[in-house]
Amino acid sequence: MNKKIHSLALLVNLGIYGVAQAQEPTDTPVSHDDTIVVTAAEQNLQAPGVSTITADEIRKNPVARDVSKIIRTMPGVNLTGNSTSGQRGNNRQIDIRGMGPENTLILIDGKPVSSRNSVRQGWRGERDTRGDTSWVPPEMIERIEVLRGPAAARYGNGAAGGVVNIITKKGSGEWHGSWDAYFNAPEHKEEGATKRTNFSLTGPLGDEFSFRLYGNLDKTQADAWDINQGHQSARAGTYATTLPAGREGVINKDINGVVRWDFAPLQSLELEAGYSRQGNLYAGDTQNTNSDSYTRSKYGDETNRLYRQNYALTWNGGWDNGVTTSNWVQYEHTRNSRIPEGLAGGTEGKFNEKATQDFVDIDLDDVMLHSEVNLPIDFLVNQTLTLGTEWNQQRMKDLSSNTQALTGTNTGGAIDGVSTTDRSPYSKAEIFSLFAENNMELTDSTIVTPGLRFDHHSIVGNNWSPALNISQGLGDDFTLKMGIARAYKAPSLYQTNPNYILYSKGQGCYASAGGCYLQGNDDLKAETSINKEIGLEFKRDGWLAGVTWFRNDYRNKIEAGYVAVGQNAVGTDLYQWDNVPKAVVEGLEGSLNVPVSETVMWTNNITYMLKSENKTTGDRLSIIPEYTLNSTLSWQAREDLSMQTTFTWYGKQQPKKYNYKGQPAVGPETKEISPYSIVGLSATWDVTKNVSLTGGVDNLFDKRLWRAGNAQTTGDLAGANYIAGAGAYTYNEPGRTWYMSVNTHF
């Protein structure tokens, strides 16, 4: 079957490349940004569920650690974990329309980033990861495109919630360079400060060649180990001295280079190579907030490191007949090196003091080939047909996560058909895809874009994803936009690997009184979601107003199973990762941009969540605000001076309704976070045409939240040893922080 799939991929690529006729050489200067036709991908950027963040917006509102801070100000976007557990609560990642970080696809220049997939998934689906939004320095970003709902489905695996496409600044045929620096100073000394500096250089390498090079170094200190002292949930017995940790620190080192060859008009080849190293500065976190003297001794140390290498070759082409192609191959290697961790019960995700190795490695190799062609067609109506194919392979060598013992202490006994020792550290999966879209201008005011995508996964089989987007002008000022698409996400390499086994003595087991195992399941189905949206938009003389309703009918969400699939000889129940039949996410997004005057602009967006429900259990899918309002007032006081005020208002945040055994949450597990707001001020001064300064303050009124623990109680509140649940209080909101940045360029 795989040979047939590979042969089909080769034929499709040959067919795509054979469509176009080379353009005759001319003396016309080459523009790197020429748009030949309006493709379906470009039309999708006009959908109601699409937002763009510009380089100037990033410059005037600089971020500290990574760009997730500014991405979260877009409609439908928040920061959260992958479940309602609250585990790793300060490692919050991008969540789009309540679908969770695992359903948010991160791209850099249109190419997927998968480094976070090298981090083990815990029993509740959480990963101890900072996500994939910090691999590009903020100052090197040209723009960020955030796609939500049906517009994102064209990107295939992992885009059921949405897509974040980070577009980097490009090289040119002229010499240019930049140097940037950023630092902040939290008003509370127990909160970690950030310093960052980076450079870029672009220029010609002869008549047809150009290059771009950038480098970056930044450091964020860890929060104090006792930052949450006095705010922790109730703890007793052996847990009495434990504390939930604050935000960990991080040291980033990045270097990236691109060489471009414009070998003919509208024809270019780009070769990219990049290397990044991210090391944490440990703040004391454990998966179950059950720190001890050994974990506390690691405070401030580097306990995990990610080494990322990426290489890509891209060919973009255009021809006299209007045909354009985009073809690339990317290789990404991530080495996740970390202190060995436990895999059983309360020790899961906790440093293993008895480990014989200081660090163990998880290596993830990701290869992707992508080819697409855009064909302008003048038949009945103006239309542009897009045809494409992709092939992706992920291979993992994990020397850490498949090592849970099945015999001896802290185990549940042997499992039939599973080796008690020396289980294979290897796992892999492949996806072959075909896709087609057609952007049709039926009238001057009506655009219809149907699409169809086919994915074949080497483990879970085939998936078909149809899509339809419609844009209908209603007079000069109003536009009605609608979309529906079937989105798709394949299970992770952990969820499908039978050698990945976790153990619990009982509390983690949904319907078992005693101990149980959780095992990877190679018989899983892919997650799917029918994403729908309807939006009405008004534009006139700089005014913009819009409202969008969205609903995602979620099928086969993958979670730890609720029903034991068997029992071993000593009575230990066996659970597997399983598909939840149905879930639903529904909400509203609104926007209002008002040109108050020639120099003052007021921009606003709001997201209101109507539903977020697992229909099997009745529980919430994630802990996110009921509503989020983002408002920015920008004033161009002088030609060289601009000022901004930002206001964000978060609605109440409700915790999970049920514990891991399906019993209603009680006592402190039901704590909600009340609505709160964050205000920021900033000013940008263009000192000269080559130098600008930005200074400001985040969280002006010093509204802080403290992490109290995980959502659910560990142990028995009526017993001697327990950690009470914290409800929704699972993360830290940092207080007032002053910052300054310097941007220079030539």
UniProtKB/Swiss-Prot annotation:
Annotated region (Disordered), positions in chain: 76-96
Query: By which gene is this protein encoded?
Result: fepA
Where does this protein reside within or beyond the cell?
Cell outer membrane
Q: Residue ranges for motif TonB C-terminal box?
A: 729-746
Q: Has keyword Iron?
A: yes
Task: Give the keywords, sorted.
Answer: Cell outer membrane, Ion transport, Iron, Iron transport, Membrane, Receptor, Signal, TonB box, Transmembrane, Transmembrane beta strand, Transport
Q: Which organism is it from?
A: Escherichia coli (strain K12)
Residue ranges of the motif TonB box: 34-41
Single GO molecular function = siderophore uptake transmembrane transporter activity
Domain annotation TBDR beta-barrel: ranges: 174-746
Recorded protein name is: Ferrienterobactin receptor
